[in-house]
Swiss-Prot record:
Highest classification ranks of the organism: Bacteria, Bacillati, Bacillota, Bacilli, Bacillales
Basic and acidic residues bias (residue ranges): 289-298
Family: Belongs to the methyltransferase superfamily. RsmH family.
Keyword terms of this UniProt record: Cytoplasm, Methyltransferase, rRNA processing, S-adenosyl-L-methionine, Transferase
Name under which the protein is recorded: Ribosomal RNA small subunit methyltransferase H
Length: 311
């Protein structure tokens, strides 16, 4: 069963300012929580295009959302191909788009997917299980310098060098096959006082490897720019991020697209062609309420940003 607690459900979907006859995109179907709530607000003329790379998520949605068959289009694809996939369905512009960039709970909780540091499983971490690159390849074949770089850049891990060195020493003797082996190496590399604070010691390295395996930051950057491009005037984009790298990327893109360019001082009216493309709906990110956090601890790091297309 594909069970998953949706984060910031109403805030994200209501923030899109749903029009019953509109066309919307859920770039991250997952457990279909956002999609279900959105579909409930659409008329028979409304449409939702939902993306996922995960076969289990798509099969689950086919069953649970069967009553919306006429309004729902399910797409098995990475959302970096957003614009291309919409064109394949004859869609050139939409009224709203949402991204929920968290790994879905079933992916985390299914040990054999290799995402979790709580279960011993083969090193995998692929969102799309037909993709070539796995966590096992990253851990065993990437150079020491590349491991240091991704642990520091994507995991913001202070002990990147020590962990990469420990991995390098271990894999010279025999390949690192499982998440459990990797967790033990990380624990050995981090000084004891640091292990006792800041959550699970493997959290940051696992995040870094997952981002590298799935090329998450590059994919998100490409998809967000495409999303802004295909929005109709007045259309909105809602983005939920779970770590500072994605949030920073979203914040900077929204800021850049909602800021005026350098103009000569004293212009009485800003020429239309210089008006910014976006208007910020959220100046500061929306975070989960106390009530939601009591029900779903995974919402703790979630941040929601919303912007509207001006023209």
């Amino acid at each position: 069963m594909f069970q998953h607690k949706t984060v910031l459900l109403r805030e994200t979907v209501d923030g899109l300012n749903i029009k019953p006859d509109g066309t919307y995109v859920d770039c991250t179907l997952g457990g279909a929580g956002h999609s279900t709530y959105l579909l409930q607000q659409l008329s028979e003329k409304g449409r939702l295009i939902a993306f996922d790379q995960d076969d289990t998520a798509l099969e689950n949605a086919k069953k649970t959302l069967s009553e919306y068959k006429g309004q729902l289009i399910l797409v098995k694809s990475n959302f970096r191909y957003l614009k291309e996939c919409l064109h394949e369905h004859g869609i050139t512009s939409v009224d709203g788009i949402l991204f929920d960039l968290g790994v879905s709970s079933p992916q985390l909780d299914t040990p054999e997917r290799g995402f979790s540091y709580h279960h011993d499983a083969p090193l995998d971490m692929r969102m799309d299980q037909s993709a070539a690159l796995t966590a096992k390849e990253v851990v065993n074949e990437w150079r020491y310098e590349d491991l240091v770089r991704i642990f520091f850049k994507y995991g913001e891990e202070k002990f990147s060098k020590q962990i990469a060195r420990k991995i390098e020493e271990a894999r010279e003797k025999s390949p690192i096959q499982t998440t459990g082996q990797l967790v033990d190496l990380i624990k050995d590399a981090i000084p004891a006082p640091a292990r006792r604070s800041g959550g699970h010691p493997a959290k940051r390295v696992f995040q870094a490897i997952r981002i590298a395996v799935n090329d998450e930051l590059q994919v998100f950057e490409e998809a967000l720019l495409q999303a802004i491009e295909v929005l109709k005037p007045g259309g909105r984009v809602s983005v939920i991020t779970f770590h500072s790298l994605e949030d920073r990327m979203c914040k900077m893109t929204f800021k850049e697209k909602s800021s005026l360019p350098e103009l000569p001082p004293g212009l009485p009216v800003i020429p239309e062609e210089f008006e910014p493309e976006l208007k910020l709906i959220t100046r500061k990110p929306i975070t989960a309420s106390k009530e939601e956090l009591e029900e779903n601890n995974r919402a703790r790091s979630a941040k929601l940003r919303i912007a509207e297309k001006r023209k």
